[in-house]
A protein has these predicted regions:
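Short polar catalytic/cofactor-binding loops
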Residues: 11-16
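Residue-level detector of conserved, well-ordered beta-strand and adjacent loop positions
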Residues: 9-10, 56, 87
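Short glycine-rich phosphate-binding loop at a beta-alpha junction
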Residues: 49-56, 113
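Glycine-rich phosphate-binding loops at beta-strand->alpha-helix junctions
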Residues: 57-63
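Acyl-thioester C-C bond-transforming condensing/cleaving domain
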Residues: 1-6, 18-47, 64-65, 72-145
């Protein structure tokens, strides 16, 4: 049984920032959107021609739900196209590409944008008891990174 060939074409990456540097206020989903827009521009592929978007993102706290979907929509992908967020520490972007290839091999998709989006500068501090208010005694703050 043969499977469709999965080909990586027109790869794009954003700049690599330094901690507390120029990208410290840029949300991960916007970095992902920039990469998606540029990949589509370079390839000449219309966003409507995509079947799926797969993006890796590890520190999802503060990014709201499904960062891949947010990046896809901000990147110009129509809202009727599905998006999957992959979370595999230190390998989410690579896993996103592998998962996109699997979608193609299984015949679920023909054109998929895959990659990763992360900004560790925006990893929030978490206060588990803050939603309902702290009372007497010490509270605790956790670093999401």
């Amino acid at each position: 049984m043969s499977r469709p060939e999965a080909v990586i074409c027109h790869p794009v990456r954003t700049a690599i920032g330094t901690y507390n540097g120029a990208l410290k206020t840029t949300p991960a989903v916007e970095l992902g959107a920039v990469a998606i827009r540029e990949c589509l521009r370079r390839s000449g592929l219309a966003p409507e021609a995509l079947d799926s978007v797969v993006m890796g993102n590890v520190i999802q706290a503060g990014n709201k739900m499904n960062p891949a979907r947010q990046a896809a929509i901000h990147g110009g992908v129509p809202v009727d196209k599905p998006a999957l967020t992959v979370n595999r520490v230190c390998g989410s972007g690579a896993q996103a590409v592998a998962s996109a290839a699997m979608e193609i091999w299984l015949g679920l998709a023909h054109a998929v944008v895959a990659g990763g989006c992360e900004n560790m500068d925006l990893a929030p501090y978490l206060m588990p008891g803050a939603r309902w208010g702290y009372r007497m005694g010490d509270g605790q703050i956790y670093d999401a990174m």
